[in-house]
């Protein structure tokens, strides 16, 4: 049997990491957080554990939350910590990845007298939070130390640990822990445990072994469920083996399990990724025939596939259907549909989609606004783009990306006065321009023959500490060349070098340009080399 192939590994009482929950480190680590006076005012005259839990939970500052906890235990007359107060502070600290005080407090909890009776939920929370921080080894140590606190480990903590190991891609350890669960930990796996093992095997692309686990589950007195089958089906889909995935679907049906929206969506996603869109559409038809409602993920998979296939009309129709069913599409999906419509020269339809989203209380964000502004400007409809921007600005704060997109469109159309007004609006909103913002403005000025003003903008760019790049210098050099003022190029180089704002690519541009023109006697290379030597 597959499940018995791994030799049982003894997990002895944990002695390898005595630093974890070490009492010797506890006092010193927490001393810096202790205060003689109440850390917050007003401090309650009467304090009960429930009130303290509320104070800790509501406190946004992690250090202050810990100070409140310590002051209550050491300085408030008659107050004694209990399991709930420890749980609240340990959860808050571990969630914020403040692990040093966590380990010190755990040492205090373990050594408390009289002993504080703990529950398993505390350890489950710690397992999760250490795992989310990528510290799966610490999660394993915590799991092994649970009995030290007078708590019996259950299948819940085992399943939490297995999930942590999967999140951290330690699939080999999942099988080892599963195999040793009963003998070393006294825990009998349940179907959720088996599903986690199946998931780990599928993640490491060992679907054949996952299938063997599926076959052996009944011998453990358990019944494979929909999640078991869907996980294996997803494994085949990830491999691109759609025929095997279909066989799993048929086996599910034969054994009396009816696929849900997730199962169908996984199958559809596999077909879409392989470009087999018609088969994905057939799966969606089957789904509806079986009276299974698609969810937001189902719609997302199909809409993205339609956009990729350049079928903007069908994507728009499905998007409308999604909104009608009260599903809220995410920003990236909206941008996909807007892009597909605009690439198909349906900018008006894209604007209509924007208005429909507003009507459905689905507030567009900066990414979506920037996408639509980009296409409106590309079509030469800068005035409409500005109106859209103003409409958005009434209820939201435009991002730098949104400002950059509209400024670029205005500069491209030669509407420099409007671009300047928008620039001023940026400053009023304390939205700091970046190299791209300066580049589009400099390019707009240069294209309109106002290179002198472009150089002034470069000076401002250098003054605020924004690094020009190769593109910035190319724009100005080309502008000077058109005006027959190439001799002024060295002044720009000197200005940049004096401010220490020249990157490697820009230096290469300078050397290539000026070394190539040395023989013409236009720009002396010696000047450039001198600038480099003194910078």
From Swiss-Prot:
Predominant subcellular localization, coarse grouping: mitochondrion
One of the record's GO cellular component terms: mitochondrion
PPR repeat ranges per the UniProt record: 82-112, 119-153, 154-189, 190-224, 225-259, 260-294, 295-329, 330-364, 365-395, 399-433, 434-468, 469-503
Organelle transit peptide residues: 1-28
UniProt subcellular location: Mitochondrion
Recorded superkingdom: Eukaryota
Keywords: Mitochondrion, Repeat, Transit peptide
Family: Belongs to the PPR family. P subfamily.
Name of the protein: Pentatricopeptide repeat-containing protein At5g16420, mitochondrial
Species the sequence originates in: Arabidopsis thaliana (Mouse-ear cress)
